[in-house]
A protein has these predicted regions:
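Glycine- and acidic
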Residues: 1-6, 49-53, 205-219, 311-323, ...
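Catalytic domains of carbohydrate-active enzymes, especially glycoside hydrolases
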Residues: 15-38, 63-70, 243, 337, ...
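Loop/turn elements at helix/coil->beta-strand transitions in domains of secreted/extracellular proteins
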Residues: 1, 26-31, 72-79, 242-246, ...
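Aromatic/His-enriched, Gly/Pro-containing loop or helix-boundary segments
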Residues: 29, 33-74, 81, 109-121, ...
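N-terminal-proximal low-complexity accessory segments that begin disordered
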Residues: 1-54, 357, 366
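Mature extracytoplasmic enzyme cores
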Residues: 11, 15-17, 22-26, 30, ...
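Hydrophobic targeting/anchoring helices
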Residues: 90, 249, 341-441
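Short, acidic/polar
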Residues: 9-23, 229-237, 349-356, 379, ...
Length: 441
């Protein structure tokens, strides 16, 4: 398979046919079409918005129909990326975008009897750092915050960072304007914890309207999945009929959040683990949020420590809850919908909130990649192992990716080495990454 990048809908039928014939001549049996704006200058995107940002419009589907027509004559299978860019979302997502918990805090010395109003809440630190790496990944800070909990904790000094103990949910003491507290002797903190939208934009989306905003869905709530299917999936099925792709492809997720959240998480956590997560929420925050773009640089250091491994135990339960929701609220409903049209799901599970082995396993074609985790043998084995235990005959990998400003530096020996590494790790289908539609700007 070759991944075929289009500059949105800035394409023409003559060039489409020319490039499909080139794929056939190069012995590719299938083509995956992915519309992207990555690599195009921002000024060019703004100037040519009407030509590029037309994915999902009538003229885009006319070009897709032409792809199917030519591919049928050439005996080439066509896969379609589910949407434009990654992760799943678009400018049409209004009701159920990706959510997070954020916090503000007040330090208090006791003993004291005090009245405190919630301090101002500001944009988390991970946002600017993430946007420095990938421009405009996170959009404007969502000021429409919802107070979810107020937690009171005692602080114990430590050379390795503050320890939180005696955590209590004191939300019930809040009168809507302020909270009145009897503070015992010692150093304490009061945490105001809010839910809001991450404002995470789908990276590289060429969907109509994406130039300004293209929100990623809440992958932990099936209402987000349903919004995506209703506003994108069903439209695509209708517009490309009677054609259909061999596979719908869902790219890696790279989900982001200060503390990734969903409205369903409180209840799901209680049901799964038999206790409330609320008092322990301050322990779950990390200094740089949860951003895959930052982990390699800053690591995953937590903001606070605990005694008796409380933080580690609660965080593990939180992860299990998140994995459960990701599987049952997004992956399975999406797969079932795709399969209902006799189309297969090709899935890169990494970067999401699921257990990777379980997530890869539900795909019809589990797919790894040679960029995530540096394309290490062990990482590639995650997809192939999951495919083997779930009896999947095809296990693919997005291959021949090189982090380099000169992409022509790959020589034949590099292709042989990278392909050999994939095959030795159990990959049996190479996705060539990739071929860019010939576009002059």
């Amino acid at each position: 398979t070759v991944r075929w990048w289009w500059p949105g809908n800035a394409v023409n039928k003559m060039q489409i046919e020319k490039e499909l014939r080139a794929f056939k001549k190069a012995k590719f049996s299938s083509v995956e079409l992915q519309t992207l704006t990555i690599g195009l200058p921002e000024k060019h995107l703004e100037k040519n918005e009407e030509q590029i940002f037309r994915v999902g419009e009538k003229e885009y589907f006319e070009n897709i129909q032409h792809v199917f027509s030519v591919a049928k004559d050439l005996d080439i299978n066509i896969d379609l990326t589910m949407g434009s860019g990654w992760s799943s979302g678009g400018p049409f997502i209004k009701d159920f975008p990706e959510k997070q918990l954020i916090k503000s805090e007040v330090e208090i010395m006791g003993p004291a009897n005090i009245k405190i109003k919630p301090p101002d809440i500001s944009e988390p630190a991970y946002v600017n750092k993430t946007n420095f790496i990938v421009n405009n990944t996170i959009g404007d800070f969502d000021k429409n915050t919802k107070l979810e909990a107020i937690i009171f904790a005692k602080i114990l000094p430590s050379k390795k960072g503050s320890i939180l103990t005696q955590l209590k949910d004191v939300t019930y003491l809040f009168d809507g304007n302020q909270i009145t507290l009897e503070v015992p002797v010692g150093k304490h903190k009061l945490f105001f914890i809010y839910q809001n939208n991450v404002s995470h934009n789908t990276l590289g989306s060429a969907y109509s309207g994406s130039l300004s905003k293209s929100l990623v869905i809440d992958h932990l709530d099936n209402r987000g999945t349903e919004e995506f299917i209703k506003r994108l999936g069903e439209l695509w099925i209708e517009e490309i009929y009677p054609n259909k792709p061999t596979n719908f492809f869902i790219d890696s997720f790279e989900l982001i959040g200060e503390l990734p959240w969903s409205e369903r998480l409180f209840d799901a956590f209680n049901e799964m683990h038999g206790y409330s997560i609320k008092p322990y929420l301050p322990l779950l925050f990390k200094k740089n949020g949860e951003s895959k773009y930052l982990y390699a640089i800053f690591g995953e250091e937590f903001s606070f420590r605990s005694q008796n491994n409380v933080r580690e135990r609660v965080y593990e339960d939180y992860l299990l809850t998140r994995q459960h929701l990701f599987m049952n609220e997004f992956l399975l409903p999406m797969k079932n919908w795709i399969n209902s049209y006799d189309i297969k799901l090709r899935l890169q599970a990494h970067g999401g909130y699921g257990n990777y082995l379980d997530s890869y396993s539900i795909a019809d074609i589990p797919e790894s990649e040679s960029l995530f985790a540096g394309g290490s043998y062990d990482f590639l084995k995650l997809a192939s192992s999951a495919g083997n235990i779930s009896n999947k005959k095809v296990i693919s990998s997005e291959s021949f990716i090189k982090i380099d400003f000169n992409y022509d530096r790959l020589e034949m020996k590099d292709y042989e080495r990278l392909a050999g590494n994939a095959f030795s790790a159990g990959i049996n289908h190479i996705v060539f990454h990739g071929y860019a539609y010939e576009y002059k700007y």
